Amino acid sequence: FQDEDLERSVWWCSGFILVALLVYAFSYVRKRRTKVEVKHWLASPFLNYLFPCLAVGISVFLLIGREEHQEVEKICRLDHWIEDKEWEKVLQSIRPEDAKQSLLQQHWALLALSQIGELSERMFAYGPTGTDSFFYSMEDGLFREYFNTSFYECLGSDNGVVHSAFQAATQTRYGMSFRALRTLIKANIRLGNTEVAEKYLVLLQHSTCHARWGEAQRKKIADQSRLEKHVSNKSIGRLLQGSRSFVVEMAAVVDHYPEDRKALEYLLCGLLLQKDLDKFAYVLHEYAFRFMNRLPRHYEEALLVVGMKHPEVLEVFSVDKTKIEQFERFYSMLQKRDEYKWMLESQFGDSFWFYYYCT
């Protein structure tokens, strides 16, 4: 389930079951041509054929029905969608309440929101507690390393992709996995290291399920050899492995690539999670303001909080009147927090205001 589509696996299993049934039917028809006298109940067809099938069916049902197995299946399915960049499927599968209970699902959901451009609109519904919700700075686990490879790939840092893929491979049982190999092949093709990519393709071709995928990658290599060598345009260092924080790393990326909206959104949302509103307002004015026709939801919410201390900020940024009315209602309820605590969470639990004042 980790490396292949579940639907394809089910079709293979169903095909083998059908072959087994055909063999049984053929042997049963041949037996009927010869009279066989059954003298003992142990030789009954029920015990010889139906009972084993029933036992296998019950065993499979009990295995599939176990909660921990369903959780593993969901994790593998989500990782498969992340690798294929099926962001909408990821968000449809991960509910906000699930993300609050599972850090891995929370990371996946926030990455998917970033990719569809809605991180600054819906982030707080998924319960982030800090910038650690964006990236695993201290990797501990195979799927966390897989997440980091996807994170680097989404930011366009293929050097980071290769490093994390090797880290993931070392945590597998055999020192390498199909997932890591596929990641290394794609990253090296983008980097222009076609010889290295071909080496990994030779390893992967010995598997049973990657023939068509390998052909597609070899076609990319052939096409690339006819074009000018392409090198990834970003070389982001190993995030959060030294003394620098996630926000500082994103600030460095934005400084080098001011047109990178994904890194800019991560920077702004990271400042919101750190509750550093003065720097948020500065970065928004210096970098992001010229890119936006309208302010995203969480940016408006943050600016209204800044405006309480620095009213002149609201003269620079235009905030929707409806949002201003919502903030006034929230703040009036906040003054009576003990009385309206449950209403604050139910009405504003997915807002920056609730995160800033109540967590």
Residue ranges, per PLM feature:
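Membrane-embedded alpha-helical segments of integral membrane proteins
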Residues: 1-35
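Extended alpha-helical scaffold regions
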Residues: 28-41, 45-48, 159-160, 188, ...
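Internal/C-terminal transmembrane anchor helices
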Residues: 40-69
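Soluble catalytic regions of membrane-associated enzymes that act on cell-envelope
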Residues: 64-239, 243, 254-274
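Surface-exposed polar/charged interaction patches
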Residues: 207, 274, 290, 305-309, ...
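Short, compositionally biased small/polar motifs
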Residues: 247, 251-252
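Terminal, low-structured helical/coil segments at or just beyond the last alpha-helical repeat
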Residues: 253, 312-359
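Intrinsically disordered, low-complexity segments enriched in Gly and acidic/Ser/Thr residues
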Residues: 276-322
